């Protein structure tokens, strides 16, 4: 890392004034998407469903570069943090990442973007924010109005109804007089172009939302280590919806800090590049969210661009090694049947999230993904409807025989739950928005 003015001397007022002038001047420089990339790695774009927007295959997610997860007045935001956010956005645009995504729930992210976005060429931007559904549509209206004021734009391209994670939240959204009707009023007024939803829900809830045919796009989780939502992606394609993949590198396995086992299995690609290539090799997927905290966070992802046309050559040997490692570690019978007959947390004594815990056991056993598995396991009990259910720490209190009656592994699973808790249990983890 390079430091300007390293030493014990404070910068003079003249230096500070000059630096401020340079920062201001840079904000008016034109931006040419992909101008910073050699021709072999130019950004690629895909039609974003019925919106017909030309969506870059990578999007700039806005939940890691902001000053705070809590709302804060603009004047409380440190200049250094704001400069880093603006440099991150400018780097995104330089490499052709024209989709800037944020949410009302991301603390100061919106208000900080609102300092920069009005100074950028609006026609080169796709701006998305997200607002959570409320029981009272007027609360939703006020929150949406605040989002638009924060961003300081005449319109946004995409509004996501944020976190349709349960049937109740879906009902708040689509019922007569609900939050979607409020969003439609903003749309008719020209302040919103397209409306979609984001979700961490079980697949069946996502399918219910898609089948309403009320949404132009969906933000969901799907990546190599968790492909459960593929039926939802197929449904989105049938409805000509845009498909945005949430957090493929973080929730997709902490791929910025992978275990050596995963590194070896994914060679010659890095686990992050492999996962990007895996996702984007499916044309039904339109864009992957990159939660950049600094300008350099895009660099490794950009390596996938010249590889997209070689996906059918590069992926099969890596996929074969990963599958063989899982077979060797877990056995064919377990791999083919472990999901069968598992109860949802709400149908399990103590609300233990048996499917998630066994999934983490598999990742830990097959790929040595200990850090990722620990982080996800210790979020259980703290994640609310974003990551529901409880750990297995007090499993001795509960009789699981009835809820596991349909599982072919009913006798084995309680022991695995105890073992997984022993290996993964530890300090409580909170969602980023609670930190």
Which sequence ranges carry the predicted segments?
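Short, low-complexity intrinsically disordered segments enriched in A/P/G/S/L with frequent Arg
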Residues: 9-12, 19, 26, 32-35
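Glycine/proline-rich, positively charged
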Residues: 69-77, 90, 135-233, 237-249, ...
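Structural motif corresponding to the early beta-alpha repeats
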Residues: 120, 124-138, 162
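Structured C-terminal cap/extension of enzyme domains
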Residues: 231-435
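A cross-family glycoside hydrolase active-site/sugar-binding cleft signature
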Residues: 59-63, 101-103, 128-130, 159-162, ...
């Amino acid at each position: 890392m390079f430091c300007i003015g390293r030493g014990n001397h404070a910068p003079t007022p003249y230096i500070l004034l000059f630096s401020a002038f340079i920062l201001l001047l840079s904000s008016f420089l034109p931006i040419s998407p992909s101008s910073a990339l050699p021709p072999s790695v130019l950004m690629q774009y895909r039609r974003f469903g019925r919106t017909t927007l030309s969506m870059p295959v990578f999007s700039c997610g806005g939940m890691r570069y902001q000053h705070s997860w809590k709302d804060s007045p603009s004047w409380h935001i440190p200049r250094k943090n704001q400069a880093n956010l603006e440099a991150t956005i400018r780097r995104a645009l330089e490499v052709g990442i024209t989709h800037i995504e944020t949410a009302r729930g991301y603390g100061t992210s919106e208000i900080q973007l609102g300092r920069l976005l009005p100074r950028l060429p609006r026609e080169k931007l796709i701006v998305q924010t997200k607002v959570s559904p409320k029981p009272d549509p007027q609360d939703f209206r006020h929150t949406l109005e605040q989002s638009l004021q924060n961003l300081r734009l005449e319109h946004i391209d995409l509004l996501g109804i944020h976190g349709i994670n349960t049937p109740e939240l879906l009902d708040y959204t689509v019922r007569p007089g609900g939050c979607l009707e409020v969003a439609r009023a903003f749309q008719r007024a020209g302040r919103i172009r397209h409306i979609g939803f984001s979700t961490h829900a079980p697949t069946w809830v996502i399918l219910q939302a898609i089948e309403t045919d009320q949404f132009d796009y969906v933000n969901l989780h799907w990546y190599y280590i968790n492909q459960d939502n593929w039926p939802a992606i197929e449904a989105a394609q049938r409805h000509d919806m845009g498909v945005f993949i949430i957090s493929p590198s973080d929730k997709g396995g902490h791929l910025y800090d992978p275990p050596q086992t995963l590194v070896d299995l994914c060679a010659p690609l890095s686990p992050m590049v492999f996962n990007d290539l895996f996702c984007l090799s499916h044309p039904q997927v339109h864009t992957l969210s990159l939660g950049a905290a600094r300008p350099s966070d895009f660099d490794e992802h950009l390596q996938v661009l010249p590889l997209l046309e070689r996906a059918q050559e590069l992926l099969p040997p890596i996929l074969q090694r990963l599958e063989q490692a899982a077979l060797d570690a877990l056995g064919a019978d377990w791999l083919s049947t472990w999901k069968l007959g598992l109860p949802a947390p709400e149908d399990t004594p103590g609300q233990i999230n048996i499917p998630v815990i066994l999934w983490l056991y598999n990742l830990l056993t097959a790929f040595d993904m200990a850090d990722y598995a620990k982080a996800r396991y210790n979020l259980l009990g703290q994640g609310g409807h974003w990551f529901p259910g409880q750990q297995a720490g007090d499993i001795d209190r509960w009789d699981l025989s009835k809820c596991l009656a349909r599982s072919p592994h009913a006798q084995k699973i309680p022991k695995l739950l105890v073992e997984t808790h022993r290996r993964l249990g530890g300090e409580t983890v909170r969602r980023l928005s609670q930190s």
